[in-house]
Amino acid sequence: MAPVGSRESLAAAIQAGADSIYFGIENLNMRSRSASAFTIDDLREIAGVCNDHGMKSYLTVNVIIYDNDMEQMRTIVRAAKEAGISAVIASDVSVMNFARSIGQEVHLSTQLNITNIESLKFYALFADVVVLARELN
């Protein structure tokens, strides 16, 4: 899995043989300030390129979602589903709930800091894949 934030880094991930990529768009992801040149209009192209190369595509929507973010979050997650993005990587329950309600696969972000079995059991109810906290080994 390779992080990508531009068409150039997507091409590099393909050339390096990555089997999947993750990326953010707009401002509802932890990478928004550092490495994302993609917009919602790029989702279909990204999904298509990944599909053409046998790769999975994961859209990060892994920030705290406030009431004023709900409409944008729904628009982004719905667009990801329609574009054929493999899954959304989420850390907020609102993203998990909405994505599941429209049939979009959900992967839970390490941002959730899941460090014990009870938390894992709980969050597994809402996700297809759970990424545990970085602190675990």
Residue ranges and their predicted role:
Residues 22-43, 60-69:
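Glycine-rich, proline-tolerant flexible connector loops at the mouths of alpha/beta enzymes
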Residues 20-24, 103-113, 129-132:
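Short hydrophobic/aromatic-enriched beta-strand-loop microsegments
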Residues 49, 55-122:
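N-terminal active-site wall of soluble small-molecule enzyme domains
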Residues 1-4, 131-137:
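Active-site glycine- and acidic-residue-rich loops that bind
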Residues 9, 94-95, 137:
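Alpha-helix capping/helix-boundary segments
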Residues 6, 39, 43, 73, ...:
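Aromatic/hydrophobic pocket-lining residues that form the small-molecule binding cavity
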Residues 18, 85, 127-128:
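A structural motif
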Residues 1-21:
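N-terminal basic/disordered segments at the start of proteins
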